[in-house]
Amino acid sequence: WHDTCAYACAFPPLRDKVVLNIADGLTGCFDGGPAANPQFICHYNTILAGSDPVAVDRIGYDMVIAKRIEEGVQEEEKAGARAFMDMAQEFKLGVADKEKIELVEIDLQA
């Protein structure tokens, strides 16, 4: 479904209603999800929020891929894995190009 999910998001009744995107990245699964074995669970300690759904997806995606590479689950990003984000960018749903995303990090240490 991920290869075509951009089509659903581009549907006019949905497209104009998405104004804030929040992704819970406090605890995540980097392999075998959604009900992964404990060795594939990690604490990203992150909440992603933005008005651009594609940019939020891209930043979250990059976090998971980096963890997969760090843990030896894969050696590099798989070709075409971001196709759904590139398609969403073509539909002008948001920005998939990491170089064009304005990322603001806020550290909330207790």
Report each predicted region and the residues it spans:
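Extended, low-polarity segments enriched in aliphatic/aromatic residues
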Residues: 1-110
